[in-house]
Amino acid sequence: MTVDAVVLAGGDGAVIDPSCRFKGLLPIAGKPMVQWVAEALRDAEMIREVAVVVPTAEGLGAWVDDIGKIVVSDGSFVDNVVAGVGAFRGDRRVLLTTGDIPAITPAALDDFVRQSLDTGADAVYPLVRKDDMLSEFPGSERTFVRLATGPVTGGNMMLIDPEIIMANQEIGGRIFATRKNPVAMARVIGMRFVVRLLLGRLTVVEVERKLGQLIGGTGAAVYTTHASIGADVDKPVDVVVAERVLYARSTGRAPDSQAE
């Protein structure tokens, strides 16, 4: 079974490049950042069709001719997700991903999709161990959360049943809006969960259970050794690290750890 993919390419890129009209157009190693993501999805075996959601289609470039669908939506996070999912027939799972993970590979995508489908869950979220992240992306400045099994960072994608998306627009918007405010998030997902998270006592099973409760379905979390899934570009140092990794791949050399 294959899945469809929605890439959310909007967002403010001005914090990195003031001339960037939206985040997906940020130049990384000679290409717009979202182009790296879209091309990896196009080449992945487990992806049927790709829809890239952008705030405007102006100036995207010729690369879009090789991508399935371009969806113009400049609304809220939830609005953009719904617009992207609406580009498909709704007959299979959808891989939601951000457009700011330029080092993503077809192999990483295929592995996550296969693992996710094997769980049979309605929504599946990837976890990357700290050691894997720092090994593949030396010099990376990520935020890690300590689970009972050790420090992890979350991936920038989710495999989900489109019916779950449509039924959870309100809660999805609230979680996204509070994602950087632990107190506000606690009001949405529960204080006990947040406290256990902050204390490093949460288990993966608890994460899965909470995800299922929030969406009114079944949730799962899977570990991936493909750290590119969690290597988003949010600040200038992330650009340096991503370009170093991409250059190292193209030359067959290991990336060094010195961020400039």
Task: Give residue spans per PLM region.
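Conserved N-terminal catalytic core of the sugar/cofactor nucleotidyltransferase
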Residues: V3, V7, K31-R93, P106, ...
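Conserved core of the sugar-phosphate nucleotidyltransferase
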Residues: P106-Q213, T224-S228
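N-terminal nucleotide-binding beta1-loop-alpha1 segment
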Residues: M1-S19
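Short, conserved phosphate/pyrophosphate- and ester-handling motifs at nucleotide-, phospho-/glycolipid
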Residues: K235
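Conserved active-site beta-strand element of glycosyltransferases/polysaccharide synthases
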Residues: A220-Y223, D232
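Acidic metal-phosphate-binding loop of nucleotide-sugar-dependent transferases
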Residues: I101-A103
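C-terminal catalytic/acceptor-binding lobe
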Residues: K210, L214-T218, V240-E260
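Active-site acidic Asp-centered loop
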Residues: T97-G99
